[in-house]
Amino acid sequence: DIKVTNNSWPDYVFEENYPIMGIRNYGNYFEKYKHLPGMPTAAEIKAQDGFELGAMQVKLLEKVEEQARYIVELQTQIDELRELLTTKK
């Protein structure tokens, strides 16, 4: 077993004041740069001869939590559109 000790955990992603990129900007970012915002590029990892496992684990969890926020946001939009459709019938 590998135990990584890290005092920083990305629960801050769920704080109201956490700045999350708009979903269209998010898509535009990785279309342009070919990696997720806030994540190192393949070239950066290669230049550093690898990465720190604990720090990368935190970044990956941060991205998972951001994805959860996007999913909830999209579901809210879907629900609102469904409501509009049912009231128009």
Predicted regions and their residues:
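Intrinsically disordered, low-complexity regions enriched for glutamine and histidine
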Residues: 55, 65, 73-75
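A detector for long, heptad-repeat alpha-helical coiled-coil rods in eukaryotic scaffold/tether proteins
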Residues: 53, 57-60, 67
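C-terminal intramolecular chaperone/autoprocessing and neck/assembly modules of extracellular spikes
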Residues: 1-56, 77-89
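A broad "ordered helical/assembly scaffold" signature
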Residues: 26, 32, 64-70
